[in-house]
Swiss-Prot record:
One GO location term (cellular component): ribonucleoprotein complex
Free-text function comment from the UniProt entry: This is one of the proteins that bind and probably mediate the attachment of the 5S RNA into the large ribosomal subunit, where it forms part of the central protuberance. In the 70S ribosome it contacts protein S13 of the 30S subunit (bridge B1b), connecting the 2 subunits; this bridge is implicated in subunit movement. Contacts the P site tRNA; the 5S rRNA and some of its associated proteins might help stabilize positioning of ribosome-bound tRNAs.
Keywords of the record: Ribonucleoprotein, Ribosomal protein, RNA-binding, rRNA-binding, tRNA-binding
Name of the protein in question: Large ribosomal subunit protein uL5
Keyword RNA-binding set for record: yes
Record InterPro entries: Ribosomal_uL5 (IPR002132), Ribosomal_uL5_bac-type (IPR020930), Ribosomal_uL5_C (IPR031309), Ribosomal_uL5_CS (IPR020929), Ribosomal_uL5_dom_sf (IPR022803), Ribosomal_uL5_N (IPR031310)
Organism: Chlamydia felis (strain Fe/C-56) (Chlamydophila felis)
Stored NCBIfam families: PRK00010.1
Gene label: rplE
TM annotation in the entry: none
Family, per entry: Belongs to the universal ribosomal protein uL5 family.
Length: 180
């Protein structure tokens, strides 16, 4: 069992139940999955660069990424149907908790001028953020990076509101901006 999952089962569940007054233990929010995605439309023109970004995403996540393809052709963007334009990875279970632990304790402190993430979610218990650079991850070899590439990370929880979601993620170690 990962350190973060153990912390969740022993401490975080109890503090969430006390704070929000859940009557049933099944109401307590749980982290269901983490989705990491990269839009690689620019890199799609260069197969070596596209492959390099796929390798970086697999090193960051620990599993092989799914290549997302264009649904239809758009001549103005020089895009053909079926052409790879992105990649995504869905983390669940142990890998999800390990990634969350690494992201909170190793990666986010490496972000330049980091003062915390925004507390705004989607209103339905999910939280997303965008990173501008993949080089903040220690798994990425800086000498092999040909072009900086951003990514989107989405935390999907069973929380019903943004307050429940951000409280859960904050207790798990994600740092948010303090309200002024």
């Amino acid at each position: 069992m990962s350190r973060l999952k153990k912390l969740y089962t022993e401490e975080i569940r109890k503090s969430l139940q006390e704070k929000f007054g859940y009557t049933n233990t099944m109401q307590i929010p749980v982290l269901k999955k983490i989705v990491i995605s990269m839009g690689l439309a620019e890199a799609a023109k260069d197969k070596n660069l596209f492959q390099a970004h796929l390798e970086e995403l697999s090193m960051i996540s620990g599993q092989k990424p799914l290549v997302t393809k264009a649904r239809n052709s758009i001549a103005g963007f020089k895009l053909r149907e079926g052409q790879g334009i992105g990649a995504k990875v869905t983390l669940r279970g142990e890998r999800m908790y390990d990634f969350m632990d690494r992201f909170c304790n190793i990666v986010s402190p490496r972000i330049r001028d980091f003062r915390g993430f925004s507390k705004k979610g989607d209103g339905r218990g999910c939280y997303s953020l965008g990173l501008e650079d993949q080089q903040i991850f220690p798994e990425v070899d800086l000498d092999r990076v040909k072009r900086t590439q951003g990514m989107n990370i989405t935390w999907v929880t069973t929380a019903q509101t943004d307050a429940e979601c951000t409280t859960l993620l904050e207790l798990m170690g994600l740092r948010f901006k303090k309200a002024q």
